[in-house]
């Protein structure tokens, strides 16, 4: 691998001159500059990123810590983050924790050693222990993206209550009165607020919620599949079902199909998130859209602002608002 000394020797100049050409830090005669650039090209020379980072105190890199990158919703946010980082000239180090506190600690230490310019942390919930751990790395500019009501993090307000209300109201407006729900774990903020939106829409329409049609999953396709199979053992079935994310809707549709039932002819289903694959479900899924693209971009922009002003003292926490929108496809039928 070529070094700066090799470039200087081929161009017949000093290493200092080569450095000035690369970094554009001083005027260099045109002939000399061309000789240096020609030597760089011939030798396929690439300046040492490590040495450069030590000199300018920046690595043009960002670390991102996530619970998982497998879930489609989070994967689409991560894609948006990576794309926006790339466009801004930053590399992204992605670390999956799988909710393991030891992995979180090890990843933070590794990213600190790599001298990343900033950190994005994206988990659906945070314990006090995890917040205390993050605070011990507070010298690194950081955006902690939280869906919960935490006072010590940046807040992502995805208006889950409004989204749950919107999904249920659409089913009601299509004539459905017997409506079930597969929600997430109700001790989690996102799941609970979507369920509360469902409750509000049912209450406004003076419809009774059948407790047997309220099933709790964990936002995985297996949960939708298992919950639907439990639902299908009941004597009376709902005409419509609100699945609180798209992958649980996929599992529910799979279970229905195995029993010879059809969506929406035998049961209407509405999802939540509008993941990319939802338009290719059979049938294409009516769902609630959340802009993962905008969420990723805003998070990166907030972090870049903190990196730029990191020497100006404590930064105020930010709020990212994501407005839910109804996307009508073909998985809900009108029975008016």
Curated annotation (Swiss-Prot):
Species assigned in the record: Haemophilus influenzae (strain PittEE)
PANTHER family tied to this protein: HTH-TYPE TRANSCRIPTIONAL REPRESSOR PURR-RELATED (PTHR30146:SF148), LACI-RELATED TRANSCRIPTIONAL REPRESSOR (PTHR30146)
UniProt xrefs under PROSITE patterns: HTH_LACI_1, HTH_LACI_2
Keyword list, A-Z: DNA-binding, Purine biosynthesis, Repressor, Transcription, Transcription regulation
Gene Ontology molecular functions: DNA-binding transcription factor activity; transcription cis-regulatory region binding
Coiled-coil ranges (or none): none
Domain HTH lacI-type as annotated: residue spans: 2-56
Entry remark concerning the domains of this protein: Consists of two structural and functional domains: an N-terminal DNA-binding domain, approximately the first 60 residues, and a larger C-terminal domain, approximately 280 residues, which imparts the function of corepressor binding and oligomerization.
One Pfam match: LacI
Keyword Ligase tagged: no
Quaternary structure, from the entry: Homodimer.
CDD domains named among the record's database cross-references: HTH_LacI, PBP1_PurR
Xref: InterPro entries: HTH_LacI, LacI/GalR-like_sensor, Lambda_DNA-bd_dom_sf, Peripla_BP_I, Tscrpt_reg_HTH_PurR
Any one Gene Ontology BP term: negative regulation of DNA-templated transcription
Keyword Cytoplasm: no
Involved pathway(s): Purine metabolism; purine nucleotide biosynthesis [regulation]
DNA-binding region extent: 4-23, 48-56
Residues reported in the UniProt entry to bind hypoxanthine: 73, 188, 190, 219, 273
Function: Is the main repressor of the genes involved in the de novo synthesis of purine nucleotides, regulating purB, purC, purEK, purF, purHD, purL, purMN and guaBA expression. PurR is allosterically activated to bind its cognate DNA by binding the purine corepressors, hypoxanthine or guanine, thereby effecting transcription repression.
Protein name from the UniProt record: HTH-type transcriptional repressor PurR
NCBIfam families: PRK10703.1
